Design a protein with these regions (language model features):
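C-terminal helix of von Willebrand factor
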Residues: 177-206
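Short secondary-structure transition/capping segments
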Residues: 164-169, 192-195
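Divalent-cation-coordinating short motifs within acidic/hydroxyl- or histidine-rich contexts, strongest
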Residues: 1-115, 124-153, 158-163, 170, ...
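Residue-level marker for buried hydrophobic side chains located in beta-strands
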Residues: 117-119
Length: 206
């Protein structure tokens, strides 16, 4: 089955089977869906890695804002998109390259590969598996991603200077310099421009 054919419920169920940080006693379903019926299916799909800016923006614009944040799932799939073991889901064009390449040096003495994830939230993580906690799950995923050599940038938008969302973004970032806290649209634009420049610098250095 191609990635485009996998809807969010199928991906959720598949990811659950490989979720190494699922706590004991947690089942594979959300405590509740934003809609009134617990039997409804999430309508959003996961888009594989792509350089198509127009398609990416259109996909993001298709997500409705319903006041809930399943941050652990966003973090989880950021990892899976970079993980070569998930190549059969995303397809050959979007398959993550081997982790070993990040420890191999090119002729300039630089890593042959950088795996980079950018996580953003505008609120606390408050949608989770029954019996689990989205914030705890997300932080554990971040720890494991960094252990694999993935560089994590985090961006908080209007999350204040303290609280669960702030702490999660701060802890998930690779270093304090990889954490951005934007209080308005202009600061958000600057944060992503700065991240883009840093990533571009890494590529140009090779």
């Amino acid at each position: 089955m191609s990635a485009s054919a996998l809807d969010s419920l199928q991906l959720l169920e598949r990811s659950y089977r490989y979720d190494a940080v699922k706590p004991n006693g947690a089942n594979g379903f959300f405590t509740h869906f934003p809609q009134s019926s617990g039997t409804c299916r999430p309508s959003a799909t996961v888009m594989p890695l792509s350089a198509d800016k127009t398609a990416l923006k259109s996909h993001v614009d298709s997500f409705p804002g319903l006041g809930g944040t399943a941050g652990h799932l966003g973090t989880q799939f950021a990892w899976y998109m970079l993980d070569p073991d998930w190549g059969s889901v995303w397809g050959s064009q979007s398959k993550g390259l081997p982790y070993a390449m990040a420890t191999e040096l090119n002729e300039y003495g630089k890593p042959r590969l950088y795996k980079i994830a950018v996580l953003m939230t505008d609120g606390e993580y408050n949608r989770q598996y029954s019996g689990a906690d989205s914030t705890t799950q997300a932080r554990e995923f971040c720890t494991r991603m960094k252990a694999e050599g993935i560089v994590i940038y985090t961006v908080g938008f209007e999350i204040g200077e303290s609280g669960s969302a702030y702490d999660t973004m701060q802890q998930c970032a690779s270093t304090s310099e990889h954490f951005y806290n934007a209080s308005n649209g202009e600061e958000l634009r600057i944060a992503f421009r700065d991240i883009a420049m840093q990533v571009s610098t890494l590529r140009l250095a090779e």
